[in-house]
């Protein structure tokens, strides 16, 4: 939850992930503009790569607004690997399975780069290496 209580506050929620096999996830991103948070801006964005017929993705964005002069936005990009990208990899002798790993790792590594705290970024990097 991004809670805006004062004037001219900013928030940005970025959720990114990869779902494979029979995995599932629920994302409830909430931006809450409280009374007194005039001139505030809140945004939430989600990017999910679906890699399996049995994955379940649930996205529930919510913007609460008790103030008039605010800007709130939300968006989601959810989908499978594009055929053109798969063709690109296959034309270079890279299997579909390896292509999926490369793309999934790249998406998750981007989260590490966007993380300001070095210890957190390193911890995330270690988990990505273990999982993929």
Protein language model features and the residues they cover:
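Active-site gating/interface segments in enzymes
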Residues: 1-132
